[in-house]
Amino acid sequence: MKIINIGVLAHVDAGKTTLTESLLYNSGAITELGSVDKGTTRTDNTLLERQRGITIQTGITSFQWENTKVNIIDTPGHMDFLAEVYRSLSVLDGAILLISAKDGVQAQTRILFHALRKMGIPTIFFINKIDQNGIDLSTVYQDIKEKLSAEIVIKQKVELYPNMCVTNFTESEQWDTVIEGNDDLLEKYMSGKSLEALELEQEESIRFQNCSLFPLYHGSAKSNIGIDNLIEVITNKFYSSTHRGPSELCGNVFKIEYTKKRQRLAYIRLYSGVLHLRDSVRVSEKEKIKVTEMYTSINGELCKIDRAYSGEIVILQNEFLKLNSVLGDTKLLPQRKKIENPHPLLQTTVEPSKPEQREMLLDALLEISDSDPLLRYYVDSTTHEIILSFLGKVQMEVISALLQEKYHVEIELKEPTVIYMERPLKNAEYTIHIEVPPNPFWASIGLSVSPLPLGSGMQYESSVSLGYLNQSFQNAVMEGIRYGCEQGLYGWNVTDCKICFKYGLYYSPVSTPADFRMLTPIVLEQAFRKAGTELLEPYLSFKVYAPQEYLSRAYNDAPKYCANIVNTQLKNNEVIIIGEIPARCIQDYRNDLTFFTNGLSVCLAELKGYQVTTGEPVCQTRRLNSRIDKVRYMFNKIT
């Protein structure tokens, strides 16, 4: 049986969950349609998803049509959950990008399409909700050509009156774009030679698989228009990116999930081989795990299975598998382009509404961060506060709702702040000698620090010979440096800095690596105090797409938000403004753009790097370390 994995992607409220329900219903996988409004769909499982009518976590279901099994990945549609989208894209054989006939191409549509093209995933456009009043498909086509790609093949004609129907074009009506994109075919056509349908179909298929041509279909998921045709298209156009024939096992973990009973599930896409129940499988060329239970989706339901074949998505109950772990032969994993996960830019303090639920909250955050690497947290050793870092305010709302719904913990969140970093201002050196008070450690250490250009990251080198100070002591110094760089003079991580281990002395046999590990961050702090540090804040590169009449306002308002305009371009009826902006200002700038353009603007942003902050220094409370803080205090007092 052929197995293909497809993604359903769209902007918020374009109808992707409803489309999934219609595909399941029309294929016979389910006997009754679920409803987003009633909260009865197969793929929106959390209370927040049902209440908001949006998808937050990746949902997986399936149907069978003739000799093909189709696994459907119903992905999120909000910017704060793009990491969930990106993790899912890597397992897809193809994608359906939904566009609402009423709303056209939205900001999120552009972001998702960019990701699909970057990762080389064949994509079909599906214009949904064509049965709504006031629809002008020619405007939607133009919107797609201007904002996504001009290389579309409209495969159907839509008759709105007297009875709405969708019919396939005849061959002669759909080949223009295919011919125009191939010089040989165009020359043959212009010379009057006949073109065989087979060579046109082959050309379309090649360009479709190469993501340089995008077939376009129509329908209404809610009214069940065009769904049967879409099922035929899915099963015939998409190919499985798997190794055919006998081969070693290879699979990749793309999702971790915890059930309400706290069972830990790992979702795995198999790319080659066969996975059997009770198999012992090597993970990422390291330890082995034993397959004790295995599930997959069959006609919309999770079912136990005893074997799974190449192309399948399987679910294992396992405590050790991590996101991106590879089962079996790592060399057989397809080499797809990767999209970097967005970098958490905000942090806040969280506490349970009921103090007695603190341990429950920490246990819950451990599970949530295990399944979502963009959520990070730590407990401040000074204040004992729980600090969360995350992407955006919607993600923060989702975490709050998830904690309440699944873990029965209500929380209180403080206003989020931007995550800063630090860099030394100048070169400096500092040495602490053995047996010289107040040094209590059996070690002498000398370190130098030097600022590096922005974006360089951390560099380390040792001038102390391994012949004198062996590897275990050298490793201890590196560990101490890593720890010391976690908190600069303002309490933030230190970056863009070169640190050199210039001098070391030990007494045998009393000195231990622990002495060097403990002393290193104290020496490093004194070097930073001599050098001074400056505060760096995250900057985003952004692109604003807006109607041309709003150019002046968008351009002139940028300095109010500390934005620097780098370039402006005119394309079709739009202006594209390219620039840089502090992360702390992006949300206000977006809100302003949305307001004065009446919602017609799109602002895309991603982390560019860190720059010296222009505002007042923002301090973060230093985390305590009982073993070295007394010594730190003594050195700070004498310097």
UniProtKB/Swiss-Prot annotation:
GO terms for molecular function: GTP binding; GTPase activity. GTP binds at residues 10-17, 74-78, 128-131. GO terms for biological process: response to antibiotic; ribosome disassembly; translation. Keywords: Antibiotic resistance, GTP-binding, Nucleotide-binding, Protein biosynthesis. Residues 1-242 form the tr-type G domain. PROSITE patterns: G_TR_1, G_TR_2. The keyword rRNA-binding does not apply. The keyword Transport does not apply. Gene3D superfamilies: 3.30.230.10, 3.30.70.240, Elongation Factor G (Translational Gtpase), domain 3, P-loop containing nucleotide triphosphate hydrolases, Translation factors. Transmembrane segments: none annotated. InterPro entries: EF-G-like_DII, EFG_II, EFG_III/V, EFG_V-like, G_TR_CS, P-loop_NTPase, Ribosomal_Su5_D2-typ_SF, Ribsml_uS5_D2-typ_fold_subgr. Pfam families: EF-G_D2, EFG_C, EFG_III, EFG_IV, GTP_EFTU. Belongs to the TRAFAC class translation factor GTPase superfamily. Classic translation factor GTPase family. TetM/TetO subfamily. Abolishes the inhibitory effect of tetracyclin on protein synthesis by a non-covalent modification of the ribosomes. NCBIfam families: small_GTP (TIGR00231), tet_protect (NF012153), tet_protect_M (NF012155), tet_protect_M_W (NF033148). This is Tetracycline resistance protein TetM. It comes from Staphylococcus aureus (strain Mu50 / ATCC 700699). The lineage of its organism: Bacteria, Bacillati, Bacillota, Bacilli, Bacillales.
